[in-house]
Swiss-Prot record:
Belongs to the universal ribosomal protein uS3 family. It comes from Pectobacterium carotovorum subsp. carotovorum (strain PC1). This is Small ribosomal subunit protein uS3. Part of the 30S ribosomal subunit. Forms a tight complex with proteins S10 and S14. The gene is rpsC. Keywords: Ribonucleoprotein, Ribosomal protein, RNA-binding, rRNA-binding.
Length: 233
């Protein structure tokens, strides 16, 4: 059977940035890693209904900065910023250093693999037919400009006795092309028949120039100079 490498892991440092960007010496590394895990676990549980796509953690000069990428920033911030202040205090207690929380809005949740997977999961838990949920996700992504999308669900689909896997793809999803900007994520639907796994791959286009192109806008290409023909004497 064909085995596939994790699409995000193989592209780290090529076209994908890390979710934790900090440096620590040998003594502090394990503590930082543990607090990162606890912060992510707490925020994921606390913001379960806030459509959180990604949590980025930075550690500048004995402090911690957490950026929450969400499709519903209003739910995270709360009334007059009360909810985000509560989150900041808990994160500071977990990490043991002063904390800062930034909110980044996801403009197109239909093109975010994590949010698409979570959307399909919630539909499956509400007993929506899995084929309808998959097709709707694919159509929405392609309508908003995705170059390709693949959705896979596996488990006791429709309450069947034997578990199986079904997938639906539209466009192209080049997993072997390292410069391809492929967003991949998974989710689990807990139904009365058991757990149904959901995987989503979204191809947004190719990134030329590696990480430098991801962080900086592309410069216009220089036009070649026209050669002047010398007249005969």
């Amino acid at each position: 059977m064909g085995q596939k490498v994790h699409p995000n892991g193989i592209r780290l440092g090529i076209v994908k940035p890390w979710n934790s960007t900090w440096y620590a010496n040998t003594k502090e590394f394990a503590d930082n890693l543990d607090s990162d895990f606890k912060v992510r676990k707490y925020l994921t549980k606390e913001l379960e209904k806030a459509s959180v796509s990604r949590i980025v953690i930075e550690r500048p000069a004995k402090s911690i900065r957490v950026t929450i990428h969400t499709a519903r920033p209003g739910i995270v911030i709360g009334k007059k910023g009360e909810d985000v202040e509560k989150l900041r205090k808990v994160v500071a207690d977990i990490a043991g250093v002063p904390a800062q929380i930034n909110i980044a809005e996801v403009r197109k949740p239909e093109l975010d693999a994590k949010l698409v997977a979570d959307s399909i999961t919630s539909q499956l838990e509400r007993r929506v037919m899995f084929r309808r949920a998959m097709k709707r996700a694919v159509q929405n992504a392609m309508r908003l400009g995705a170059k390709g999308i693949k959705v896979e669900v596996s488990g006791r689909l429709g309450g069947a006795e034997i578990a199986r896997t079904e997938w639906y793809r539209e466009g192209r999803v080049p997993l072997h092309t390292l410069r391809a900007d492929i967003d991949y994520n998974t989710s689990e639907a807990h139904t009365t028949y058991g757990v149904i796994g959901v995987k989503v791959w979204i191809f947004k286009g190719e990134i030329l120039g590696g990480m430098a192109a991801v962080e900086q806008p592309e410069k216009p290409a220089a036009q070649p100079k026209k050669q002047q023909r010398k007249g005969r004497k």
